[in-house]
From Swiss-Prot:
Swiss-Prot/TrEMBL GO biological process terms: methanogenesis, from carbon dioxide; methylation; one-carbon metabolic process
Protein's UniProt keywords contain Membrane: yes
Quaternary structure note: The complex is composed of 8 subunits; MtrA, MtrB, MtrC, MtrD, MtrE, MtrF, MtrG and MtrH.
Protein name: Tetrahydromethanopterin S-methyltransferase subunit B
InterPro entries on file: MtrB_MeTrfase (IPR008690)
Functional note: Part of a complex that catalyzes the formation of methyl-coenzyme M and tetrahydromethanopterin from coenzyme M and methyl-tetrahydromethanopterin. This is an energy-conserving, sodium-ion translocating step.
Keyword Transmembrane helix: yes
Residue ranges of the TM segments: 79-99
């Protein structure tokens, strides 16, 4: 928001963006809100990317082209990874329990 002083003697200024000519007053503060608006737009873009990350069919915000389904694939591999380790833990516990119940399994 740029302001040009048309006549400094009688305190008249013109807003370049709108072409409005008005009296300059000391009790009014003029603030440029364009940086704030840019920051709000950037935060809105991040919020939209976060919202899109909840749908596994969408690609991440700064991903290369053709990366649709990344979240779906990651979710599938995560389930397989944790499922494998949980199954292994249960298998070890069952094996230890079976050996303690029947010591003849290990030759004692």
């Amino acid at each position: 928001m740029d302001i040009v002083k048309v006549c400094p003697e009688i305190q008249i200024a013109m807003d370049i963006d709108s072409g409005l000519i008005a009296e300059m007053r000391k009790d009014i503060l003029v603030v440029d809100l364009h940086p704030v608006e840019d920051e709000i737009n950037r935060l809105a873009q991040y919020a939209k990317a976060l919202e899109n990350s909840l749908d596994p069919r969408n690609s991440p915000m700064k991903a290369y082209a053709g990366r649709e389904g990344t979240y779906k694939l990651a979710g599938m591999f995560q389930g397989m990874f944790f499922g494998f380790w949980v199954t292994m833990a249960i298998l070890v516990l069952v094996t230890i329990l079976a050996v303690k119940m029947n010591l003849s399994l290990i030759g004692l």
